[in-house]
Amino acid sequence: MIQITVVQIDNYGPWTVTPNPRRESDLQALQSRLYCDMNLQFGAHKGLAFYTRFDNIIAITNGIDLETHKRIQNSVKNRYPFTVSMAVASAETAYEAQKLATKTIQEYGSAQDDVRKEVLDVANEFVSNGYVQLAHVDINDITGKLTDLETAYDTYLSVQKTKLKLMEELKKYDSLGFFIGGDNFMCPCNGMNEKDFLCMFEDIKDSCGIELKAGIGIGKTAEDASNLADIGLEVIREGKTDSQVYTLKQEIDEQKNVPYNYMCPI
């Protein structure tokens, strides 16, 4: 089981134009700061956040309890000119978990409802014995094939086309895909295997002409899984395997319950 938290800014659209439209550079900086904060605060408890649309953030939160969510929510209220709502859900796949979490927030009203503030709810249950599977995907030799040859914008366009195709293919497996900078994508993919990725990469190569590789990490938390995925990708980059997909799994001994202060100050 994977645990997902959906974070949504309350009544954000109307706030950006009240009493007058706010300066765009300030709004962009504010959104980026919130995303940074969510990664730092969830990351302090071994979670991982993705910006999606900036006013809606998706986080992997295995091992993070309700009280910690509340502390993060209060921290936003104390330091930002708006509040956020949060819903937590767990499921066998990342797509299903975020679907349940999104539905839970939507049941409280519209994202632009001025009376809906600081929702904090749990769709089903908190994960105690689940796991997180993450794939760190990147483009083969983007520097030699795109960055050093094409314009900055054309390279960006190629990366965005690849991202869209990757996201569409991942959704077929009830998995998610997020752009994390450069030519890199992080994909919550509980339930997928190496063969699934190889088939998917072949389809993307045929349609986009882009070759991909992936390190897959399986761990107790998002931090554990992402670290292993990063190591797996380095194994491929260093030519230590012939495959374009390499999986590393956290050892059982490492997953035993150990004291961890989930309630530490944020």
UniProtKB/Swiss-Prot annotation:
HAMAP family: GTP_cyclohydro_3 (MF_00608)
Gene3D superfamilies: 3.30.70.270, Nucleotide cyclase
EC code: 3.5.4.29
InterPro entries xrefs: GTP_CycHdrlase_3, Nucleotide_cyclase, Rev_trsase/Diguanyl_cyclase
Protein's GO biological process: biosynthetic process
Domain of life: Archaea
Gene coding for it: gch3
EC top class named in words: hydrolase
Protein name: GTP cyclohydrolase III
